């Protein structure tokens, strides 16, 4: 049912008031009580009317629920009104911080729009409550009419009721005065009381103000107040006029009643009576109030007593139980309906009571102010709503106005039955009760307090029975108990008169009996006056010291009252401790903080005022102090400044004195160092001059002799002979250079030089004595040798040139003197031959056959072996290289016992590399070598290397260093070579650096002035130990080499890459450039790597990233299969494996009916009529004319017409086709008009030969004959068509869409025949060469009988034949500036028949260059570091012997040492080396002995890059070499060519020089 639904929806917060309840109290522990109500309807209504009424009631309930929800939302929106002012204030405060910014005000406007929309929504919601308000107004109008009628009756009976009421009240006052006092004090402690009387509920409109003021009766009228609140909230807006009008009517009645009340109120003598009298005038109906007050005061005592008995689980006892049963039986007789109530009571716990009291206290505190403000309006509203028929469901019974009046008059009030509101009541009454229920449920406070579940379990319209299950919570159970007690108390009041009549008799009997009375009374009651006057205050003496409050009570009652008041007292204390104490503590704390804040404010104000007073009074004192401090500060600054100036002057004077002293000391030190260096130089010069005079180096150098230098040298060395000078060594550290004169220093220097010479001779003599084995005749003593001119040894199988023979004499003299030397002839002058001639000279003249040690780079090992074998065949050579096992076997040939080698020794000369020297140092150091030759001695230029240290530790009689560049980078390398040959003279690198290095290197770098005297002294020191000759001085037939620097500009791609690298480098670019010019091994590795990246950009941008092959996406499916071979089937037909993923399925019905000819269509008839019946070739006359011209028969013409196009093309290519016949006809007509047989046959034979040639040209598609027969076509295709590149590159490519007809074999057979017809496939494809050979040679098939092939046309352009595009080589060439210049240069060099050496630093660049040369079809070979020794020998041999090789690609480090490449006349450096001497050695591979043509050297450089910086640094290093070795102070002249046409001119000029 919908009623059950309504009750179930509100079971959490609705209360159901049940009429006429029969209560059965049982002491159980259950938490709820089940009430089953059976309602019987009357016989006047039918079931149909009930259903209609219930349906209508349900609709009203639904509407009320909706309105309730709207009202709740309205309350939420109403809260915005309270905060509107606060929001406006907050916005005003925020607007101050917005600083008049447009964005901030835009944000404010958006907020205002938002809140405006919310306010409009609130107004719409507020207007939606009109329907509910109209319904409530109707109810109020009906109730007002009834109230007016009842009020008119009450006005007429006011006087009589007041008189009777005052009398009854005075009678009851003597017994209830003490009770009122105690209950009023108890009510103040508690939040709300737990009992209510039926009369108070009946007249709630007249006593509402007293209920609000008195806290003890607040909970009693809570249900009524909830109804008042709900109605007020509904009527506040729309019914103000009606309410005010009604309130005026009520106010007039209340005024009259107040007047009557003031007249009838008694005088109050005691304090309790005054309190009661002060509350009486506030009521609206004094007669009812007086009656209710008397009943309330008399009932409170019983209620409190009953509460205490409930706590002890003893609800009622003895007599009370019997009286309650009588009341219940009387009520059952008066009820019209049968209501069955089954209830259970719970045991109450003290904790639950306290919690409920706490909740009630909190709610009362919150409601206090609101109830006082709206008290008068609520009274008027309640009087308008309620009428005489209203009653509380929990009230056991109500009395009408007449009954109350009769009771006030003193008549006994008998309970009159009142019909409760049930389902069968009037509609208006039911609606009014339900509205009350709903309004009660709206109030959150009532929901919180009265949470009772009620569920309609069953409704039977036939039996007129409605069963409702009501579950009462603890609060309602307690309330029910109080209602029961109220019913009991009403019965007691009726019997009160009987008890009062017996009171006098009881007092008299007590006086007569005395102490023997069994009944113990505490105090005797006072007799009341008959006219209701003042009470007698005569009391019996209190014997138990318990408070009796002026009443007669037993000991048990006194204890119960005391216990009740104690509990109330402790409850109040607990509430105070729990609530008020915390509030007071917070309040005290807040007061203290406010007080402290005020103190601080006062103190700050006082301090500010005090400071103002001080400023006014002590301003002059403050100014005086300020001036005094300023004066003191200025005085201190003055004296500090004065002291600082004096201190600075003193320091300056001391500094000047120290500088002067330091300068004088430096001058003395410079003089001393100059004398020291002069002493050391003089010592070295004397030794060098003496050795030079012995070996005559000046005569050997030829044109390089300096006359002025020789004169100075002779003047310096006059009167000094080392042979006659005593050999006394004087340590220069012990010499006092400050006091010694020049002559004494020169004498000591001569003694030291003589000592060095003597030690050198002794060392040589000792080595010779060890190797002579004690022979008598010794020819190796150099002192016994005179100045003999040495001739060419006879065992030397070559003829030495004049300068080479002089070099042999110089080397022989060095050997005789026991001095080591450096043969530093320019590359290409035959240093190898001169060194081999010295070994031959020792073997031939002195019979010294070894052991000789030759150490050379790995690239020249085979060259040395070949040279020695060629020039001195008698020498036995031991090639010491290979793996460890090979070297172990070679070491067996060493003869360590015989230190003197002869011609029959196992070997004479051992040739090894520098790597082997380092790895096998322990074995090589054990040998004593007669002569050690180091080829390319710049390999030991570093004194810190392991090569230098290991070779210096070898036991050798003489050491010879062969190098064309003794100085590569700096003077330190020269000192390393000099110390290697003469450790005793050149022992300190620091001294050598002080002598020469600083001056010469600074001159080369900064072009400073060079000390010529110091340079001459250096040359004088070096001359005895180093022989240096250049080609132009000693070799007149060898022409000069031309060096050309070709400057190029970066291409666009290179420039972008270069800028990107510069931007990504964290280090400054200038620092990187300096690192590029500095070849010091200690440089930062990161810098070197950065330089290499820039050099890559200069060489070619593809060194970073190669161009990718471009190909479209293939939208195809590729075939996948396993092995295709089958048993007994050597040939397998393979269809096209690549197909399109898209397949079009043609419906078979369409193919059969519309495409294939059949009996249902006319396709066959149309084909016959078009191709046969109406064909022009079907005419007989036309066919005759055609056959006359072509020579074909009528049937052949028809076959040609009806044949396929491809078959006709194949037929035309046959030897005796129509074309051949036409050629025959044309030849006959050209030669002779007569058709004689002789002419015809001769011409026919000629035509047949041409047909054979034509067939041969077609068969040999790639042969020489094809090229000869198609010269024009070949040239046109190669020059024009193949030069065109594809400009469009598709993104996707795919195979054609395949068509399939499922279930039709005819289509698949026809498709396969067209795609794979053997005749067409053979005609389109070319016959393989192997098949042609078998047909022509083995099977003897004539060429003109070969089947037609190669009809598929070849593409006009190779780049258009496929969508796969390879990177363009033209773009590859033009993207590199160097490669573009090289491409132009090679064209000119190829025309001039030059042969070119191209040197590279990077092997990856060599790979790119090979691709370029292959594209240009230049023949070339390559040699780099990865080439093996055997391959290197073969490559050099091929280059020297094969003139068809145009270009030789070499790595500068691998191919620039010790090899002879004189077949080339042009050298191109694609990129330069860090060390200029490496490049010099590389170019001298071609510019050397045996070169008959002019040698031109091209060096490709990029302007404005790191390469230009490296080139400048290389020129500085070359200048140092020229200064030291040749004495030149001017740099070498190198021609520079800018980017343009000068390269071709230079190449042409070099070609002209070569031809001349």
Curated annotation (Swiss-Prot):
Residues 759-769 have a biased composition (Basic and acidic residues). PROSITE patterns: DBINO (PS51413), HELICASE_ATP_BIND_1 (PS51192), HELICASE_CTER (PS51194). GO terms for biological process: CENP-A containing chromatin assembly; DNA repair; positive regulation of transcription by RNA polymerase II; regulation of TOR signaling; subtelomeric heterochromatin formation; telomere maintenance via recombination; transcription by RNA polymerase II. Keywords: Activator, ATP-binding, DNA damage, DNA repair, DNA-binding, Hydrolase, Nucleotide-binding, Nucleus, Phosphoprotein, Transcription, Transcription regulation. GO terms for cellular component: chromosome, centromeric region; chromosome, telomeric region; Ino80 complex. ATP binds at residues 825-832. Residues 1381-1535 form the Helicase C-terminal domain. It catalyses: ATP + H2O = ADP + phosphate + H(+). Its main location: nucleus. Coiled coil: none annotated. The keyword GTP-binding does not apply. This is Chromatin-remodeling ATPase INO80. The gene is INO80.
């Amino acid at each position: 049912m919908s009623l059950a639904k309504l009750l179930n929806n509100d079971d959490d917060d609705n209360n159901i008031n049940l009429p006429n309840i029969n209560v059965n109290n049982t002491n159980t522990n259950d938490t709820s009580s089940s009430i089953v109500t059976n309602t019987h309807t009357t016989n006047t209504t039918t079931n149909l009317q009930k259903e209609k009424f219930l349906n209508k009631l349900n609709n009203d309930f639904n509407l009320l629920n909706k309105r309730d929800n709207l009202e709740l939302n309205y309350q939420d929106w109403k809260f915005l009104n309270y905060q509107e002012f606060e929001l406006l204030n907050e916005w005003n405060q925020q607007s101050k911080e917005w600083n008049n910014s447009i964005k901030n005000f835009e944000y404010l406007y958006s907020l205002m729009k938002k809140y405006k929309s919310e306010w409009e929504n609130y107004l719409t919601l507020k207007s939606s409550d009109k329907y509910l308000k109209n319904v409530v107004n109707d109810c109020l109008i009906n109730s007002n009419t009834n109230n007016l009628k009842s009020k008119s009756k009450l006005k007429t009976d006011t006087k009589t009721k007041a008189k009777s009421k005052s009398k009854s009240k005075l009678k009851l006052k003597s017994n209830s005065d003490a009770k009122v006092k105690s209950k009023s004090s108890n009510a103040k402690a508690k939040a709300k009381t737990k009992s209510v009387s039926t009369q108070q509920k009946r007249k709630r409109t007249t006593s509402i103000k007293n209920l609000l003021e008195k806290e003890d009766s607040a909970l009693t009228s809570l249900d009524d107040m909830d109804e008042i609140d709900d109605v007020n909230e509904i009527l506040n807006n729309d019914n103000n006029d009606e309410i005010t009008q009604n309130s005026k009517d009520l106010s007039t009645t209340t005024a009259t009643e107040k007047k009557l009340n003031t007249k009838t109120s008694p005088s109050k003598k005691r304090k309790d009576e005054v309190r009661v009298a002060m509350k009486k005038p506030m009521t609206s109906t004094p007669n009812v109030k007086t009656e209710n007050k008397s009943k309330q005061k008399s009932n409170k005592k019983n209620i409190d007593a009953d509460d205490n008995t409930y706590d002890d689980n003893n609800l009622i006892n003895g007599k009370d139980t019997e009286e309650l049963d009588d009341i219940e039986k009387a009520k059952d007789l008066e009820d019209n309906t049968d209501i069955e109530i089954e209830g259970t009571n719970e045991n109450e716990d003290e904790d639950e009571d306290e919690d409920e009291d706490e909740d009630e206290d909190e709610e009362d505190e919150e409601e206090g102010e609101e109830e006082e403000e709206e008290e008068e309006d609520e009274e008027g509203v309640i009087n308008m709503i309620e009428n005489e028929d209203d009653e509380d469901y929990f009230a056991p019974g109500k009395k009408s106005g007449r009954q109350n009046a009769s009771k006030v008059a003193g008549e006994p009030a008998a309970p009159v039955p009142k019909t409760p509101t049930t389902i069968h009541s009037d509609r208006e009454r039911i609606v009014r009760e339900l509205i009350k229920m709903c309004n009660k449920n709206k109030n959150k406070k009532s929901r919180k307090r009265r949470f009772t579940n009620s569920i309609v379990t069953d409704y039977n319209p036939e039996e007129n029975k409605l069963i409702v299950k009501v579950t009462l919570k603890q609060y309602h159970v307690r309330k029910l108990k109080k209602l029961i007690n109220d019913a009991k108390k009403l019965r007691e009041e009726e019997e009160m008169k009987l008890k009062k009549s017996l009171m006098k008799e009881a007092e008299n009997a007590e006086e007569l009996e005395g102490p023997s009375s069994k009944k113990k009374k505490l105090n005797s009651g006072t007799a009341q006056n008959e006219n209701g006057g003042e009470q007698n205050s005569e009391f019996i003496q209190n014997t138990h010291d318990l408070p009796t409050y002026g009443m007669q009570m037993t000991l048990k009652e006194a204890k119960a009252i005391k216990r009740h008041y104690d509990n109330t007292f402790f409850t109040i204390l607990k509430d105070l401790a729990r609530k008020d104490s915390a509030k007071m503590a917070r309040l005290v704390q807040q007061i203290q903080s406010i007080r402290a804040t005020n103190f601080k404010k006062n103190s700050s104000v006082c301090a500010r005022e005090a400071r103002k007073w001080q400023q006014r009074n002590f301003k002059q004192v403050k100014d005086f102090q300020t001036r005094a401090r300023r004066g003191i500060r200025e005085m201190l600054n003055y004296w500090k400044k004065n002291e600082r100036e004096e201190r600075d002057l003193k320091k300056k004077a001391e500094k000047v004195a120290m500088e002067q002293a330091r300068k004088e000391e430096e001058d003395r030190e410079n003089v001393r160092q100059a004398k020291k260096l002069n002493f050391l130089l003089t010592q070295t010069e004397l030794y060098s001059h003496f050795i030079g005079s012995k070996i005559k180096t000046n005569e050997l150098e030829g044109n390089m002799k300096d006359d002025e230098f020789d004169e100075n040298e002779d003047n310096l060395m006059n009167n000094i002979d080392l042979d006659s000078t005593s050999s006394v060594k004087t340590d220069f550290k012990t010499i006092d250079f400050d006091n010694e004169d020049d002559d004494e220093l020169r004498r000591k220097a001569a003694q030291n030089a003589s000592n060095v010479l003597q030690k050198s001779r002794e060392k040589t003599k000792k080595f010779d004595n060890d190797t002579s084995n004690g022979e008598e005749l010794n020819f190796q003593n150099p002192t016994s040798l005179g100045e003999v001119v040495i001739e060419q040894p006879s065992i030397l199988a070559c003829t030495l040139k004049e300068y080479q023979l002089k070099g042999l004499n110089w080397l022989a003299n060095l050997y005789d003197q026991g001095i080591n030397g450096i043969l530093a002839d320019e590359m290409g002058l035959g240093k190898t031959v001169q060194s081999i001639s010295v070994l031959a000279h020792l073997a031939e003249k002195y019979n010294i056959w070894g052991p000789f040690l030759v150490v050379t780079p790995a690239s020249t090992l085979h060259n040395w072996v070949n040279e020695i074998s060629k020039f001195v065949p008698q020498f036995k050579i031991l090639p010491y290289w290979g793996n460890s096992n090979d070297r172990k076997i070679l070491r067996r040939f060493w003869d360590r016992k015989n230190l003197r080698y002869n011609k029959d020794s196992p070997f004479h000369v051992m040739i090894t590399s520098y790597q082997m020297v380092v790895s096998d140092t322990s074995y090589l150091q054990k040998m004593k070598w007669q002569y050690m030759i180091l080829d390319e001695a710049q390999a030991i230029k570093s004194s810190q290397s392991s090569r230098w240290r290991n070779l210096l530790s070898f036991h050798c009689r003489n050491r010879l260093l062969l190098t064309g560049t003794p100085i590569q980078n700096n003077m330190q390398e020269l000192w390393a070579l000099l110390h290697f040959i003469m450790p005793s003279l050149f022992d300190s690198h620091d001294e050598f650096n002080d002598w020469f290095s600083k001056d010469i290197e600074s001159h080369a770098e900064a072009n400073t002035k060079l000390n010529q005297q110091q340079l001459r002294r250096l040359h004088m020191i070096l001359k005895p130990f180093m022989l240096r000759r250049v080609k132009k001085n000693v070799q007149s037939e060898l022409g000069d080499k031309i060096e050309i620097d070709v400057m190029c500009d970066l291409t666009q791609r290179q420039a972008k890459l270069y800028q990107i690298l510069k931007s990504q480098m964290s280090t400054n670019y200038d620092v990187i450039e300096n690192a590029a010019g500095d070849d010091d091994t200690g440089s930062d590795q990161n810098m070197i790597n950065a330089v290499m990246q820039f050099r890559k950009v200069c060489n070619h941008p593809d060194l970073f990233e190669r161009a990718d092959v471009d190909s479209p996406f293939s939208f195809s499916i590729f075939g996948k299969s396993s092995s295709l071979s089958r048993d007994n089937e050597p040939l397998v037909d393979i269809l096209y494996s690549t197909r399109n993923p898209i397949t079009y399925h043609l419906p078979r019905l369409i193919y059969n009916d519309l495409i294939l000819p059949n009996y249902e269509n006319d396709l066959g008839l149309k084909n016959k009529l078009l191709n046969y019946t109406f064909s022009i070739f079907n005419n007989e006359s036309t066919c005759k004319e055609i056959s006359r011209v072509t020579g074909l028969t009528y049937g052949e013409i028809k076959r040609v017409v009806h044949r396929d196009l491809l078959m006709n093309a194949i037929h035309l290519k046959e030897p005796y086709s129509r074309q051949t016949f036409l050629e025959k006809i044309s030849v006959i007509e050209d030669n002779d008009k007569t058709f004689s047989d002789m002419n015809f046959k001769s011409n026919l034979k000629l035509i047949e030969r041409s047909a054979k040639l034509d067939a041969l040209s077609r068969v040999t598609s790639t042969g020489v004959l094809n090229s000869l027969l198609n010269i024009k076509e070949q040239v046109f295709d190669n020059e024009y068509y193949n030069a065109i590149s594809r400009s469009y590159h598709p993104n996707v490519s795919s195979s054609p869409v395949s068509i399939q007809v499922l279930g039709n074999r005819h289509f698949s057979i026809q498709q396969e025949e067209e795609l794979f017809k053997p005749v067409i496939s053979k005609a389109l494809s070319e016959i393989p060469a192997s098949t042609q050979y078998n047909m022509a040679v083995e099977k003897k098939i004539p060429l003109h009988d070969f089947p037609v092939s190669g009809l598929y046309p070849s593409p006009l352009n190779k780049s258009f034949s496929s969508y796969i595009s390879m990177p363009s080589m033209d773009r590859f060439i033009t993207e590199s500036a160097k490669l573009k210049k090289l491409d132009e240069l090679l064209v000119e060099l190829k025309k001039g028949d030059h042969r070119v050496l191209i040197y590279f630093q990077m092997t990856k660049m060599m790979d790119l260059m090979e691709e370029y040369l292959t594209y240009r079809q230049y023949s070339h070979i390559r040699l780099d570091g990865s080439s093996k020794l055997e391959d290197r020998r073969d490559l050099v041999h091929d280059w020297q012997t094969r003139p068809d090789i145009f270009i030789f690609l070499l790595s500068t480090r691998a191919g620039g040492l010790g090899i002879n490449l004189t077949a080339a006349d042009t050298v191109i450096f694609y990129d330069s080396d860090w060390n200029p001497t490496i490049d010099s050695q590389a170019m001298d591979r071609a510019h050397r002995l045996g070169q008959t043509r002019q040698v031109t050297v091209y060096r490709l450089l990029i302007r404005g890059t790191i390469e230009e910086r490296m080139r400048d640094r290389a020129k500085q290093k070359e200048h140092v070499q020229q200064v030291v070795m040749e004495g030149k102070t001017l740099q070498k002249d190198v021609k520079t060519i800018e980017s343009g046409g000068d390269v071709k001119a230079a190449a042409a000029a070099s070609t002209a020089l070569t031809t001349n």
